[in-house]
Every structure is written in C-alpha cells, then in structure tokens.
Amino acid sequence: MLQIFKHKKLKVLKAIFISYDQAHHEAVVDILTRLSCRGFTSFGEVQGRGSKTGDPHYGSHAWPSIASATLTMVEDDRVDSVLARLRELDESKPLLGLRAFVWNIEASI
C-alpha cells in the first residue's frame, strides 16, 4: 500500500485561523474566493479581545461589537498571498480589528 503513495506528490497544507469584526466577513470570504481558497469554515459569532489594542467583541450591552472567525486550509504556497490581502483589509479599517494565525497541518482525511 505504501507504494501507491510513493509517486503521489503530497501537498503541504497550512491552516489559517482568521478572527475579525463581523463587518469584515464579506471581505474575508471575497479574499478567499479570489485567491481560489475554496474550502473554509466560518464561525458566525465569536467573542474575544485582541492582545494588543482594540475593544472587546462580546456582543453585550457594554461591549456591543461582535466578532466572527474563519478557518481555512490552504496550500503552503498560497499562505503569503492570503496574509497579504488580509493585512491590506486590516490596515484599511484598523479600528475594526483582524488577526490571522497560521498552523501546520500534520494529517487530514
């Protein structure tokens, strides 16, 4: 069975976790679509607070902003392009907040 996979070129995948103000959602999906990152999972409403600056996103009376998050798996050679576009989006509206983190994918099915 190992011989079957010997000749297949395995793609190196990375996970990109993107946390952002809900106002960025359409733009985040558009970035992924334009860069041919077809598969992703969005978490519609999440709560959190940035580690450096920015207001908490708790969806409460005191902190009404709401955050969203998206997780996507992309080929290693697309990571830099995705991060560059996300950085541009974040810099265009810095008060909203957007963070992205990249992890190695060790295995998948």
Please tell me what each predicted stretch does.
Residues 1-109:
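Positively charged, small/polar-rich N-terminal and surface patches that mediate targeting and assembly
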